[in-house]
């Protein structure tokens, strides 16, 4: 008797339940509670909190290097966004975990409000200067109406690209992991030796996905800082 199991390739992106607790809720709560844990609340921080403080200082130095002092008040917000995205990305690599940042509903919920706030602040502080960016310097008079439309569209495309880049890269990586792990499972049941090269590729790909999870969190926050630097 042969039993057939049908597995959807996109089924891993649907939230599972553990003890009647939705895994999507668990992953988001874990990412947010992680912030409260890593920030020291006592006079003598622990060894882990000291290591985290050094890591946070290095991240802030990478993101805020060669920047104006006007962006300093935004350091706390950008650092928090980085921690939340990094925690959700890494947590999604665990088996049966829900990758919240692979859904554009979450990535747009993070990117669009920040982009909107930054641009509203930019137009409020320097309205004429922001309008002048819609027409690049040296543009012929005949092309000014066209350039205004192009620059306006590129401006509104920023939050779309910001959220879509994060979700698409994580989705692609998880699909590759799913396909390779399925191939290993099918080959190991028939011929163990043939699954060894695929397993080696799988391990290397998983290590690469850990790096992608960290890099995507950095790219998201670096782009947010870039948009902030254009407006403040």
Curated annotation (Swiss-Prot):
Residue ranges of the TM segments: 18-38, 74-94, 107-127, 142-162, 173-193, 195-215
CDD domains: ATP-synt_Fo_a_6
Keyword flag Acyltransferase: no
UniProt keyword terms in alphabetical order: ATP synthesis, CF(0), Hydrogen ion transport, Ion transport, Membrane, Mitochondrion, Mitochondrion inner membrane, Transmembrane, Transmembrane helix, Transport
InterPro entries noted in UniProt: ATP_synth_F0_asu (IPR000568), ATP_synth_F0_asu_AS (IPR023011), ATP_synth_F0_asu_bact/mt (IPR045083), F0_ATP_A_sf (IPR035908)
Membrane-protein topology: Multi-pass membrane protein
A GO term from the CC aspect: mitochondrial inner membrane
Gene Ontology MF, one: proton-transporting ATP synthase activity, rotational mechanism
NCBIfam families for the chain: ATP_synt_6_or_A (TIGR01131)
Family affiliation: Belongs to the ATPase A chain family.
Role this protein plays: Mitochondrial membrane ATP synthase (F(1)F(0) ATP synthase or Complex V) produces ATP from ADP in the presence of a proton gradient across the membrane which is generated by electron transport complexes of the respiratory chain. F-type ATPases consist of two structural domains, F(1) - containing the extramembraneous catalytic core and F(0) - containing the membrane proton channel, linked together by a central stalk and a peripheral stalk. During catalysis, ATP synthesis in the catalytic domain of F(1) is coupled via a rotary mechanism of the central stalk subunits to proton translocation.
Subunit structure: F-type ATPases have 2 components, CF(1) - the catalytic core - and CF(0) - the membrane proton channel. CF(1) has five subunits: alpha(3), beta(3), gamma(1), delta(1), epsilon(1). CF(0) has three main subunits: a, b and c.
Name the record gives this protein: ATP synthase subunit a
Gene from which the chain derives: ATP6
């Amino acid at each position: 008797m042969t039993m057939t199991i049908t597995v959807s390739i996109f089924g891993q992106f649907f939230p599972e339940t553990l003890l009647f607790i939705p895994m999507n809720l668990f992953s988001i709560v874990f990412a947010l509670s992680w912030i409260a844990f890593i920030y020291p609340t006592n006079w003598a921080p622990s060894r882990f909190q000291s290591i985290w403080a050094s890591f946070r200082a290095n991240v802030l130095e990478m993101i805020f290097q060669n920047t104006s002092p006007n962006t300093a008040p935004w350091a706390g917000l950008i650092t928090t966004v980085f921690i939340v995205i990094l925690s959700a990305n890494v947590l999604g690599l665990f088996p049966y975990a829900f990758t919240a940042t692979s859904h554009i509903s979450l990535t747009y919920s993070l990117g669009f409000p920040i982009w909107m706030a930054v641009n509203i602040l930019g137009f409020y502080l320097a309205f004429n200067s922001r309008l002048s960016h819609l027409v690049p310097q040296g543009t012929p008079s005949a092309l000014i109406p066209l350039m205004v439309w192009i620059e306006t569209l590129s401006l509104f495309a920023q939050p779309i690209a910001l959220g879509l880049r994060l979700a698409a890269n994580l989705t692609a990586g998880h699909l590759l992991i799913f396909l390779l792990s399925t191939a290993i499972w099918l080959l190991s049941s028939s011929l163990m030796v043939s699954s060894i090269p695929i397993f080696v590729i799988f391990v290397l790909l998983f290590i690469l996905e850990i790096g992608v999870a960290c890099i995507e969190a950095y790219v998201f926050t670096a782009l947010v800082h870039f948009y902030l630097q254009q407006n403040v």
